[in-house]
């Protein structure tokens, strides 16, 4: 049986922490969809098309990863993709309550969808897209936290 997993998020922008989880998910599952959510309720810095393009560039080296933008309910997207696994990251205890609620709701809506939680490597356990954008807005060096092309795109957007 082929395992197809979805790793969903806004990825505004995709960080090295996200790439760490994605790379590990790509080793665990036959096919992984990096599902980039439109997230109209969030005030994203990058458009959905820009986030998809940046993620495609950053994931070229992962042959079993496909980047797709979506605006559906996650379970509807999972059904369309014929995926049975949802990959989520847990950085800290604070993430757990929210992720537990999401997992329970997703399982209620689609009982065949299993949530699998991965913890980031220690090096990336404290970063988030929001934090990286905030540091960059104030002139801090974010080169360690983002792929090179995304650093350039972020700095162009902010300045």
Curated annotation (Swiss-Prot):
Gene3D superfamilies: HUPs (3.40.50.620). SUPFAM superfamilies: Nucleotidylyl transferase. ATP binds at residues 10-11, 18, 89-91, 99, 124-130. InterPro entries: Cyt_trans-like, PPAT, Rossmann-like_a/b/a_fold. Transmembrane segments: none annotated. Pathway: Cofactor biosynthesis; coenzyme A biosynthesis; CoA from (R)-pantothenate: step 4/5. It is found in: Cytoplasm. Belongs to the bacterial CoaD family. Its EC number is 2.7.7.3. It comes from the Bacteria. GO terms for biological process: coenzyme A biosynthetic process. Substrate binds at residues 10, 42, 74, 88. It comes from Pectobacterium atrosepticum (strain SCRI 1043 / ATCC BAA-672) (Erwinia carotovora subsp. atroseptica). The lineage of its organism: Bacteria, Pseudomonadati, Pseudomonadota, Gammaproteobacteria, Enterobacterales. One of its GO terms (cellular component) is cytoplasm. Reversibly transfers an adenylyl group from ATP to 4'-phosphopantetheine, yielding dephospho-CoA (dPCoA) and pyrophosphate. GO terms for molecular function: ATP binding; pantetheine-phosphate adenylyltransferase activity. The keyword Membrane does not apply. The record marks 18 as: Transition state stabilizer. Keywords: ATP-binding, Coenzyme A biosynthesis, Cytoplasm, Magnesium, Nucleotide-binding, Nucleotidyltransferase, Transferase. It catalyses: (R)-4'-phosphopantetheine + ATP + H(+) = 3'-dephospho-CoA + diphosphate. Pfam families: CTP_transf_like. Homohexamer. This is Phosphopantetheine adenylyltransferase. Its cofactor is Mg(2+).
């Amino acid at each position: 049986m082929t395992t197809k997993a979805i790793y969903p998020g806004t990825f505004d922008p995709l960080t090295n922490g996200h790439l760490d989880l994605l790379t590990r998910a790509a080793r665990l599952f036959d096919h992984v969809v990096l599902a980039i959510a439109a997230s109209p309720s969030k005030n994203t810095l990058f458009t959905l098309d820009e986030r998809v393009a940046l993620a495609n560039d950053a994931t070229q080296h992962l042959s079993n990863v496909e980047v797709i933008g979506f605006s559906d309910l996650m379970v509807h997207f999972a059904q369309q993709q014929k995926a049975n696994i949802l990959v989520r990251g847990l950085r800290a205890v604070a993430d757990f309550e929210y992720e537990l609620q999401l997992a329970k709701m997703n399982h209620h809506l689609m009982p065949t969808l299993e949530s699998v939680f991965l913890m980031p490597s220690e090096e990336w356990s404290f970063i988030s897209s929001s934090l990286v954008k905030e540091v960059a807005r104030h002139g801090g060096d974010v080169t360690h936290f983002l792929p090179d092309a995304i650093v350039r795109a972020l700095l162009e957007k902010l300045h």
